[in-house]
Amino acid sequence: MRALSQDYYIALCTELIEHDRRYYVLDRPTISDYSYDMKMRELQKIEAQHPEWKVPWSPTIYLGDRPSGQFPVVPHSHPMVSIANVYSLEELEEFFSRTEKLLGYFPTYSLELKIDGIAVAIRYENRTFAQALSRGNGVKGEDITANVSTIRSLPMTLPQDAPEEVEVRGEVFLSYQAFEKLNICQREQGKLEFANPRNAAGGTLKLLSSREAAKRNLDLSIYGLITNREEHSHFENLGLCAHWGFPIAGMPKQCRTKEEVIERIREVEGMRSRLPMAIDGVVVKVDSVAEQHRLGLTSKHYRWAIAYKYAPERAETILQDITVQVGKTGILTPVAELTPVLLSGSRVSRASLYNEDEIEKKDIRIGDSVYVEKGGEIIPKIVGINLAKRSPDSKPWKMPSLCPMCHNPVIKERVSVRCTNPLCLGGMLEKICFFASKGALNIDHLGEKVIAKLFEMGLIRSCSDVFALTENDLKQVPGFKDRSVHNLLASIAGAKEVTLDRFLTALSIPFVGSSGAIALADHFGTLDKVMKASLDELLSIEGIGQKVAASIIDFFSKTENVEEICRMQELGVRILPKQVDRWAPLQGKIFVLTGTLQEMTRLQAEERIRSLGGKISSSVSKNTYAVVVGREAGSKLKKAQELGVQVLEESDLLKILNQN
């Protein structure tokens, strides 16, 4: 049993805010909706028990979506709040009781499929499509008109019997078929695949190119008409929308009793696996618009609607084998190879096993009949074992003592197992993929699939080999024509001039990510100084601790790493030294950002501070110049106050940036 404390409460708030960021901003959630909702309920329960602990930035107060900073933010005509979730018939009964108590009678309900997509508000002027907004924070949303206009099922004009001004609410989604085609395209281009259709739809709506958005075949289902007229029911309004040409994929149905509601929920669950798009439940709405207006809404949810959510889809299949992959830093990761099974609209044949300890903890064995579930990740996970089907001859699985790629010994490091060979081919393939990726050197046309082909043909075996590729080499690659060869060689040539921080990131130094690389570049200015840095010099840098400093020294002490860097330079790679403008207005001043900014993203703020000579740190110390606080500022604000460090509101930071 976890001990309940205020520190745990704060940690839970922080965790949920991070999950909100991954879900709404990055479109790459790492937990399932069910897991998120269970954590949110735990938070609500703690706040009910300890109201004195409740912080003003609690995720129970605000509505999720944050602006990406790429599109104009526009106020909604009517609040666009979310719908509360329930996971059991008992909780649904509580909703019925609350509603009946407020109205004085049991109302008629309208039920619709809860399509797993992105909510949008769509407005028409003079019966012509005028604007589309994302949900945003419920009060304001981003203007995504250009991308929504690419949806083929969206009518551009309405018939003459429609009002001149119309606003509808709907869900933008990708069908399973469109999602599968999109991920095939992503794989072929060496790009990261989307975890699920919802993430893909969200990512598409945030594309800056509507031409690219059009290629992805988004779809739309309208679920509401904004109206003050109360003579029609919600169900009738959806009928009007259908008459005007709007797509209604939610299969609405009126239910006049609890029994009818429950029967419909079970009916939809039975057809769930046969639907062409992802759904995660059924939305239950009070059908009368007049009754909806009487019931109103809270700061986060409508009182007249509830979403009955189904448990995450899971499937049972056979664990045929456990293979081991080698990552870019040499870490061995076990992967479950499964008998292919259909799950959430796609065929699943692999599942994540994380590490040896996880396998041992769950006692997962080859040959087991296992339950797999898809959460927020591309690769599903094993959530259980059908022990009744386990063979009496099965044996516990053990991590190999030799690397499966190079057959050198491996060593155990806490929970991970690492190959001891720095030149391991498995690790090198992953290292080259990262080296060329968007987060490192960003070499266009050199995706994972192309790198795998080059590696398989023996044309590359190290990162420096990328810069040695010739026209004749590339013409040997199957499917590579003159234009492909020209484009890739041009991209490689362009990558030969690289900033110090990006080059350091691309080297895959253990424990050194992009922020650590920026800190090193800011402090030392040149690669030569970084390579010769002492432990004390490294430890003096804000954000560099003992573990990271030791890793940097170890990396540059190895002959093979130094030789690799020298070869790159011989092949024409020019590492641009960090230019230090000693007259820059924020030169040397350390900033810490905490909370959510409203006028710009955190990344944009960090870039602007760095452009004026400032530095970014993740922790507050006596050396911090200022802590910039946004919405839901956390423990860093408290630490700044304790140390007497200057605290700036976002408006204060904007004044400083705009003045310079």
From Swiss-Prot:
PANTHER family referenced in this protein's UniProt entry, alphabetically: CHROMOSOME TRANSMISSION FIDELITY FACTOR 18, DNA LIGASE
Residues at the active site: K114 (n6-amp-lysine intermediate)
Top-rank taxon, per record: Bacteria
Descriptive protein name: DNA ligase
GO molecular function: DNA binding; DNA ligase (NAD+) activity; metal ion binding
Species, as recorded: Chlamydia muridarum (strain MoPn / Nigg)
One CC-aspect GO term: cytosol
Sequence positions that bind Zn(2+): C403, C406, C419, C424
Keyword vocabulary terms for this entry: DNA damage, DNA repair, DNA replication, Ligase, Magnesium, Manganese, Metal-binding, NAD, Zinc
